[in-house]
Curated annotation (Swiss-Prot):
Name of the molecule in the record: Molybdenum import ATP-binding protein ModC
Annotated Mop domain residues: 313-377
Source superkingdom: Bacteria
Keyword ATP-binding set for record: yes
Keywords: ATP-binding, Cell inner membrane, Cell membrane, Membrane, Molybdenum, Nucleotide-binding, Translocase, Transport
Family assignment from sequence similarity: Belongs to the ABC transporter superfamily. Molybdate importer (TC 3.A.1.8) family.
Enzyme class, UniProt record, top EC level: translocase
Residue ranges of coiled coil: none
EC number(s) stated in the UniProt entry for this protein: 7.3.2.5
Location relative to the cell: Cell inner membrane
């Protein structure tokens, strides 16, 4: 990219993520009543969710990544290219960064057809730099039937799909999405989510996705940054962050964890499908999916009970060997238990009486009885 600088040594904290494929970001800026102060090392692939309440700094951080805000204390390296280093007075402006930006409201030209909107997005990208063919972007978002329609006559979901395709057509090295589903009703959201999942599965570019909706984060994200008051409270793989007892996720009434698994077998006689994760089975209502398909499941903390022995005289199909990692007893009547199941985090919410009777303490081996499993993708 013209204006990009090869990545070299930098002062930014890298944490556990290293190498030229990582995203390394440090920003410090503010105004009366708010200050953003983050120092992050993020993966260079997959969907990275910026999650937090309104005013937590999600969009400000996204704008810093885009170069729309210039932090006086700023450093940004994206997959081997240095985009900002204020210590060197280096700042690559937005129009010279190979990124795509999708806003809450699709910013299309209403007087142009969908095809013309897409072609407009290609104008600033030299032919030699086009790594994502326009036809591929069109196919990924399923918009071929819309190409000759006027953009002003599209539904909200259709407009967002076109906006995402236009962003992809610029062959970005980083795709930024600022609550792209926020303006859509439930039906339109459900229509567009499968297309976002396809981007995740088929494109090798990092996507930074802003959302305050836990269900979107659970379905799409690989990595989560939890923001509050302009600071990062936590950052890490979604399965780890969602299960941390010191974070708000785990204390929600609908607290859950996500489990990435594969389809291992179908039991047609009982209309069930056996998923497998970490070598363990997880039964779910029958799926019409090929064997070896990758899926993501959700398990609510309230749907997990504990036993000291493996029970075979119960209607519960999913009984998993586990070890107690930690407890939270902030609720006067209930105990939240974090479990380790063959390296996968699981949460169980049980009564304090049950925890006392069973002797639930860190290090105790137990059996997690999972009463319900929902498929996210």
């Amino acid at each position: 990219m013209s204006g990009a600088v090869p990545f070299g040594a930098g002062a930014v904290r890298t944490g556990a993520i290293t190498g030229d494929e990582a995203i390394r970001a440090r920003f410090g800026l503010g105004w009366p009543g708010f200050r953003l102060d983050v120092d992050l090392a993020l993966p260079g692939r997959g969907v990275i969710a910026l999650f937090g309440h309104s005013g937590s700094g999600k969009t400000t951080l996204l704008r810093c990544l885009a170069g729309l805000e210039r932090a006086a204390d700023g450093y940004l390296a994206v997959r081997g290219e240095l985009w900002q280093d204020e210590a060197q007075r280096l700042f690559v402006p937005t129009h010279r960064r190979p990124l795509g930006y999708v806003f809450q409201e699709a910013s299309l030209f209403a007087h142009l057809t969908v095809r013309r909107n897409l072609e407009f997005g290609l104008k600033r990208v030299p032919a030699a730099s086009r790594r994502i063919p326009l036809d591929q972007a069109i196919a990924l978002l399923g918009i071929e039937p819309l190409l000759d329609r006027m953009s002003g006559r599209l539904s909200g979901g259709e407009r967002q799909r076109v906006a995402i395709a236009r962003a992809l057509a610029t062959s970005p090295r980083l795709l930024l999405m600022d609550e792209p589903l926020a303006a859509l009703d439930v039906k339109r959201k459900q229509e567009i989510l499968p297309y976002l999942e396809r981007l995740h599965a088929e494109l090798d570019i990092p996507v930074v996705y802003v959302s305050h909706a836990p269900e979107e984060v659970a379905r799409l994200a690989d990595h989560v940054v939890l923001l509050a008051d302009g600071r990062a409270l936590a950052a890490g793989p979604i399965g780890e962050v969602m299960a941390r007892l010191d974070l708000p996720f785990a204390h929600d009434e609908d607290a859950f964890v996500v489990i990435d698994a594969r389809v291992a077998a179908h039991d047609e006689a009982y209309a069930l499908t056996r998923l497998e994760f970490a070598g363990l089975p997880l039964w779910i209502t029958g799926l019409d999916m090929p064997l070896a398909s990758r899926v993501r499941a959700r398990v609510l903390a309230r749907d997990v009970s504990l036993a000291l022995t493996e029970r075979h005289d119960s209607s519960i199909l999913n009984v998993l060997p586990a070890r107690v990692v930690s407890l939270d007893e902030a609720d006067p009547g209930r105990t939240l238990v974090r479990l380790d199941v063959a390296g996968t985090a699981l949460l169980a919410r049980i009564t304090r009486r049950s925890a006392a009777q069973l002797g639930i303490v860190p290090g105790r081996d137990v059996y997690a009885q999972v009463k319900g499993v929902a498929l996210l993708r």
